[in-house]
Amino acid sequence: METTHRVFVEDSRDLSTLEDDSVELVVTSPPYPMIEMWDDLFTRLDPAVEDALEAGDDRGAFEAMHAQLELVWDELERVLVPGGIACINVGDATRSVDGSFRVYPNHARVLEAFESRGFDPLPDVLWRKPTNSAAKFMGSGTLPPNAYVTLEHEYVLVFRNGGESRDFEPGADRRYEAAYFWEERNRWFSDVWTDVRGELQDLTEDATDDLRDRSGAYPFEIPYRLICMYSAYGDTVLDPFWGTGTTTRAAICAARNSVGYELEEAFLEAFDDGIGEIAALSRSVGRARLERHRSFVERRREAGDVPGYDAEHYDTPVVTKMERSLRLREVSSIEGESGRYRVEHEPLSVSSD
């Protein structure tokens, strides 16, 4: 199996390099409005943002920032296939402007924007990303009533483009081989994820401190899960806010195609420096999934409840008929650089089979 991966150093408010209905899934984490680390970016996109902040017009700044994101949402409506899924990882912001502290509900604003463009909202996910700082509590400490709840979660908002789900040809191998294990379904499709911790995506050792400071990447597990949940082999995943390339890395490990857009070429250079590690990552991710499944089966067996079906490609039982054709892939080779990559995948090699 071969997949292709492209990264454009371009502004994602204009995705004219992509044709209509050319991607099946969007997985992205945009810059969060009213988070201070993104003020400079939003100001470059629209100087009115800085003017509003300097004037203490927090609501005006909030709306101006979201107006820039909405130009991207307009493009997503065009390039995403009917029935395709968009997964938007976004967090709310807390901030004091002109001496007044409040929360800025980014998730609600994004939800409104997508629904107004004809997307159907689907059940979303909260993922908890606890911080361990001793000073994480805001306000008056232990004195009521002026202390504030600390935000330790982000949202994965899920939307379908239009009212109908995607169609597949009956018995499509690319869909059945992309199945997930029954116990993965139960964990992944829970509305609260407590087993994924927030962290900065590791960059290469020679990346500059400035590049690290500007990295707001979500953990690899977030896009990897979403890609497995909402796409099949042969699909293309788009990330219009590419950053350090976590979505592309996850798409490669999941054996899907991908497209990314990024304003800063330095992130692409850092991705090229670490591309040699992706083959080993894909192998370890696949083997970990299979080993977790085998441990799950063993626990079921000890409880006297052995799953009733056999996997076709692995020496293990599975719970449902739909899992029988499941086939994991690993990377055998990667060619290319500077935003154009061709990846060869082969069935996961597991010595214990």
Spans of features found by a protein language model:
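S-adenosyl-L-methionine-dependent nucleic acid methyltransferase catalytic domains
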Residues: 1-138, 184-353
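Flexible, glycine-/basic-rich loop-and-beta segments that form/coincide
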Residues: 128-203
